Amino acid sequence: MKRAVVVFSGGQDSTTCLAQARHQYDEVHCVTFDYGQRHRAEIDVARALALKLGARAHKVLDVTLLNELAVSSLTRDSIPVPDYEPNADGIPNTFVPGRNILFLTLVAIYAYQVKAEAVITGVCETDFSGYPDCRDEFVKALNHAVNLGMAKDIRFETPLMWIDKAETWALADYWGQLDLVREETLTCYNGIKGDGCGHCAACNLRANGLNHYLSNKSAVMAAMKQKTGLR
């Protein structure tokens, strides 16, 4: 039996990954993290979506220690969430240092226990947010280290790594989940489901991608298929 575990936030990207994984694996588990994030509503959204999309199991792990260690606008209400601009060093204040290091490591431990062959994460380098832990180089390096540390061959999959946000919408549409992703996921840094607040960087990226996809469906779908190998 082919098993996979999805790092699942209930946002556009991880929900699209879950929708695809349900077609590619016999059994799919989801892991969501409570790290005291500003947009904690995503945890309840993730629970509902994991159930709706047929995840075999869904775990919510408490990693609130990360909130104490990592200062970010996503972990501190006193720091305003930006619209577009990163800091002078190119890293936006929404970056939570160590988040993906911790998340991927913990999910790999869970995958080891349930005998899953893959850990799936929705990180992407194409519409680069400036987050160093979303880079392909990082994911591959951590995957290698984790496998060495557990003497296990668990594959870190990044289905969205080389597609842009419009193509991510196309991928959701390909799997018949465009409306669900648009209406029921939570990507907004301010914790508003669906189309979100319309102002934060996450909402702007999501909306621009959706508008581009809806205006150029056939071309974007074709580009997505070419990049992902889907037919």
From Swiss-Prot:
Ligand binding (ATP): F8, S9, G10, G11, Q12, D13, S14, T15, T16, C17, L18
Swiss-Prot/TrEMBL cofactor(s): Zn(2+)
Top EC group: ligase
Keyword hit for Nucleotide-binding: yes
Keywords: ATP-binding, Ligase, Metal-binding, Nucleotide-binding, Queuosine biosynthesis, Zinc
Binding site for Zn(2+): C188, C197, C200, C203
Molecular function terms from GO: ATP binding; ligase activity, forming carbon-nitrogen bonds; zinc ion binding
Co-factor note (free text): Binds 1 zinc ion per subunit.
Record's catalysed reaction(s): 7-carboxy-7-deazaguanine + NH4(+) + ATP = 7-cyano-7-deazaguanine + ADP + phosphate + H2O + H(+)
GO process terms (BP): queuosine biosynthetic process
Pathway noted in the entry: Purine metabolism; 7-cyano-7-deazaguanine biosynthesis
Domain of life: Bacteria
InterPro entries according to UniProt: QueC (IPR018317), Rossmann-like_a/b/a_fold (IPR014729)
EC number in record: 6.3.4.20
Similarity field: Belongs to the QueC family.
Protein purpose: Catalyzes the ATP-dependent conversion of 7-carboxy-7-deazaguanine (CDG) to 7-cyano-7-deazaguanine (preQ(0)).
Database matches in HAMAP family: QueC (MF_01633)
Name of the protein described by the UniProt record: 7-cyano-7-deazaguanine synthase
Provenance organism: Salmonella paratyphi A (strain AKU_12601)
Lineage: Bacteria, Pseudomonadati, Pseudomonadota, Gammaproteobacteria, Enterobacterales
